[in-house]
Amino acid sequence: MKKYRDHYFLKAKRENYPARSVYKLKEIDKRFGILKQGMRVLDLGAAPGSWSLGAAEKIGPSGRVLAADIQTTETVFPPNVTFMQEDVFERSAEFEQALSETGPFDVVISDMAPKTTGHKFTDQARSSNLCFEALAVASLHLVEGGSFVVKIFMGPDVEAYVKQMRTLFTAVKSFKPKSSRSESKETFYIGLGFKGLPEFSEQEGED
């Protein structure tokens, strides 16, 4: 195990986080200042729960985190975090209700990653699908001015994805945390200042 991996792995154990990924979110927040007291946060791909715990600490007891993942987790969350086992592509009525009751959200964060096959292009395509779905959910449930954080594995679809992000946010930034493994293809994109969905006029819908 490399020294930098030792450092973040052991640090997570000492600080009672289930995974080292929490430090990626902390770096992103330190750089862009997206998390504040009292905010409502939607965490997609939340298991095992490090990002939810990190967000919950920053937003405090008056804030709320709604966390979802297709996998379950044994992590014990504080009272301001609600975890639901959900498939973001096939959202249940219960999850849709939770989205409505907890949202709209000030921040949507997505650390979703597909099960890897070892085939570069297949893995990139699956990652891209998750990213587009996360963006779709964010666009429906963010407040105007809200922020979006998404993990992307670099590939041929990234340019089109970022182009779509730019239509929805006033600024889009890329960021590679120091706590990411140097050999990892992951990069995080941060959308700042959600503009809201474009209005659809009746004339546009006419033939």
Curated annotation (Swiss-Prot):
Cystines in this chain: none
Entry's localization field: Cytoplasm
Binding sites annotated in the UniProt record for S-adenosyl-L-methionine: G49, W51, D69, D87, D111
Pfam families recorded: FtsJ
Any one GO molecular function term: rRNA (uridine-2'-O-)-methyltransferase activity
Active site (UniProt): K151 (proton acceptor)
Name of the protein this chain belongs to: Ribosomal RNA large subunit methyltransferase E
